[in-house]
Design a protein with these regions (language model features):
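N-terminal amphipathic alpha-helix/helix-capping segment at the start of soluble metabolic enzymes
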Residues: 1-20, 74
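Catalytic alpha/beta core domains of metabolic enzymes, predominantly
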Residues: 12, 116-250, 254, 259-265
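Hydrophobic faces of well-ordered beta-strands that scaffold small-molecule active sites
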Residues: 17-23, 45-49, 83-85, 104-106, ...
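Active-site mouth loops of central-metabolism enzymes
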Residues: 17-34, 58-60, 82-87, 107-108, ...
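A structural motif
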Residues: 41-44, 101, 156, 221
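Glycine-rich, proline-tolerant flexible connector loops at the mouths of alpha/beta enzymes
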Residues: 48-66, 230-239, 295-306
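Catalytic beta/alpha-barrel core
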Residues: 64, 80-89, 93, 102-116, ...
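Domain-level signature for soluble enzymes in the chorismate/prephenate branch of the shikimate pathway
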Residues: 260-355
């Protein structure tokens, strides 16, 4: 998939990661400037703060709006950092550009709405500003790509993606499920698109930010956007997921950034073994499907239903236990066999519907 892109060229002391940091919300001039100066002293080059805050429920702090934009301008003037804020409407775009905001990002609630995305895209026509598009709240890669395409078709070539995880009713560890396979697939389809990880919104807790930052680096993400506040416990929004500039600096100092492209003969040989295993897997799946088609013919001849629930549950239980003995998670095995079963049912239905 092709997008017409130019490098973001974000300032950074190293090739990877670029880091955008700052409070969830621009609360007061004092809070903004204190946080910004502390981050600048730690070597941060890009400052983020929410000016307009789309909250899940009414009644919470929803941002200071235009009142906060002069504070962002002051940050740039006094520290030299680039400034970034979230925009959700054409009016937001107009005001952000009026006050010299350097980087715009689109939030998860906005990217999930094609009407809102098109309105933003129209407002960005003829503008040369970097835009980062956050994944939609629901795990829909096509919706994410569509949002990126709309902005790109408006003429925005300095484009990036933010991965902040996906909403889930069942919240166990993370505030938003990482579902790393989705940004990985986005990178596979659009390899030239920079992807930035938001560990603050994925984790929802300070103690998860460091491991999530490291995992993002291990997966080859280009940068991090992290919520940092001069006094996190007193934050007006998302206090639990913000860290002080000092703590953020410590987290970043511990990161191990691995080479993305370095390869050796030993690695090449191991990948050859993987390829051979994959070939064997495909042969076994083809053999299994041949047997499934024979079963489909038998069911048709004996007027049996395609789905035999007891048999399917038996397979899931047995293969889950087998996976655990082999050092794999039962959930992983269940996902595999759900897909295999889905394809088996599809092929048997074809046989059943043959005249």
């Amino acid at each position: 998939m092709e997008l017409d892109l130019e490098p973001l060229n974000f300032p950074s002391d190293q090739e990877r990661p670029c880091v955008i940091a700052g409070p969830c919300s621009a609360e007061t001039e004092e809070q903004v400037m204190s946080t910004a100066k502390q981050l600048a002293a730690k070597g941060c080059h890009m400052f983020r703060a929410g000016v307009w805050k789309p909250r899940t429920k009414p009644g919470g702090f929803e941002g200071n709006g235009e009142t906060a934009l002069p504070w962002m301008k002051q940050v740039k003037e006094e520290t030299g950092m680039l400034t970034a804020t979230e925009v959700a409407t054409p009016e937001h775009v107009e005001l952000a550009l009026k006050y010299g905001i350097d980087i715009l990002w689109v939030g998860a609630r906005t990217s999930a709405n094609p009407f809102a995305m098109q309105a933003l895209a129209d407002s960005l026509q003829g503008v040369d500003v970097p835009v980062l598009v956050t994944n939609p709240v629901n795990p829909d890669l096509e919706l994410w790509i569509g949002a990126l395409q709309r902005i790109n078709q408006a003429g925005i070539k300095k484009l990036g993606a933010i991965h902040r995880g996906f909403s889930s009713f069942d919240k166990k560890i993370y505030r938003n499920l990482p579902m790393w396979q989705i940004p990985i697939e986005l990178h596979r389809r659009i390899p030239q698109l920079p992807i930035i990880c938001d560990p603050s919104h994925i984790g929802g807790r300070r103690d998860l930010i460091a491991p999530l930052c490291q995992q993002a680096m291990d997966l080859g993400f280009d940068g991090l956007i992290v919520e940092s506040h001069c006094s996190p416990d007193d934050a007006w929004s998302d206090a639990k997921q913000q860290v002080t500039p000092e703590v953020l600096d410590y987290i970043l100092s511990l990161l191990v950034v691995r080479d993305e492209h370095y390869s050796t003969e030993g690695l090449h040989q191991l990948r050859g073994q993987i390829d051979e295993c994959d070939n064997q897997l495909m042969d076994l799946l083809a053999k299994r499907m041949r047997v499934c088609r024979e079963i489909g013919t038998y069911k048709k001849e004996h007027n049996m239903t395609i789905v035999q629930t007891n048999r399917y549950n038996e397979i899931l239980d047995k293969r889950g236990a087998q996976a655990a003995l082999c050092g794999m998670s039962p959930e992983f095995a269940a996902q595999i066999f759900e897909h295999i079963h889905e394809e088996s049912v599809r092929q048997q239905l074809e046989i059943l519907n043959q005249k």
